[in-house]
Amino acid sequence: RAIRDVYKRQALGLPCAAVYLLALVVFIPFRYFGSSMYGLPVDVVGRGASAPGVHQDLASFLSALLSIYSGTLLGFVDDVLDIRWRHKLPIPLLSSIPMLVVYMAGGGSTSIVVPAWPPLLRQALGCSSVHLGWLYYVFMMLLATFCTNCINILAGINGVEVGQALVIAVSVCINDVLYLNIPGVIRAAWESSSDTPSPAHILDGYHGSTDLVVRHLFSLHLLVPFIGTSLALFLWNRYPARVFVGDTYCYFAGMVLVSCGILGHYSKTLLLFFFPQIFNFVLSCPQLFGLVPCPRHRVPFVDTGSRTLYPSCVRLTEHAFPTRLILALLEQLGCVQRIYDESGQVVGTTNLTLLNALLVLRGVRVAPASKADLLASKSKTDPVLRPAPVRHTLCVSEHALWYYTMGVQALGSAMAFTVRYWLSSIIFPAT
């Protein structure tokens, strides 16, 4: 039993990515069959279906494949060589170059709309939009870096990497479908004497904007196969996991999502669906920037007696005022638990991650650190503190923690839709 639980197949995100890329390559002839895009005549789609428009769309599609392929390859290299964090951060920058070049060659917009509320902003700038130029490309490169690494940072329990990517992908697909005239297609199919009504009805979508519809169809063509392959991988990676996805899947999933956002021209909307990942990054900042010691692994600990999880901890080597202030504030918010020794002095804290924060919020507590615990955590390179859990507090299994995490991810998607379709109509009334 112990051998089956310990020795798992690693980096199984690679077969998932390989099947996905193969499916998209096979899909290319069906996507561009005939003389126009999606099999629609030129007089229906307009200039977007002409030869230059089809070539530009094909270039975008191939650049997405190249970026996803390079991200997957570099992720697999990371799994094999175990690259350090400071070296792996620039990897997505290299993978994003093909799609950014195609975005630039296609005349992609580099302007942002200035919020209409408060009115002082537009009055001060004297315009309703600001042209960022090369700064917009810097933003998109940073977005590629964030989307790939944030999935990797929010990891540590069975199924959480694939689960969060699936929730985000399904949410983005729902957002894409909102731009399509699905009722019009159904109505045309019901009223048409032909068994297969013209697909032109799909282009009567969002406020009559053909460009928006084509962009979101492009996004759907990338996301639907991704959801299918990820679901198959999830069946093997869910608790109790039979395989591990590795960094390969994290890079692969991040590049798929960021390719849809950049080439679909909704990069800012895509960022809204990463609310939990943004929270996890902000929560981790004190450890990432050295205010609190950061061990190599911050995943929750397993209580061997009950087989449940409790927050992992780190020993505090310094007690600077900013560190004490941040930890006191986070403890008041219920995100961390400070660890005390037998004399009542603060000697450690739970690690600053979303998974540990959920355990603390659910009431899982850690006992005061003993002298033996403190002696065992004197390593400066990996200052892990391992106090025992408080047995009479709430116990949370790994399976339950996965459900809590997915609930937070779904709540983040609901917040994203609220911001995108309600709050944005107040701040950007003209758009």
Task: Enumerate the predicted regions with their spans.
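"…together with the soluble PPM/PP2C metallo-phosphatase catalytic core" -> "…together
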Residues: R1-L288, A416
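C-terminal membrane-associated helical module and adjoining short loops/tails
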Residues: I262-T431
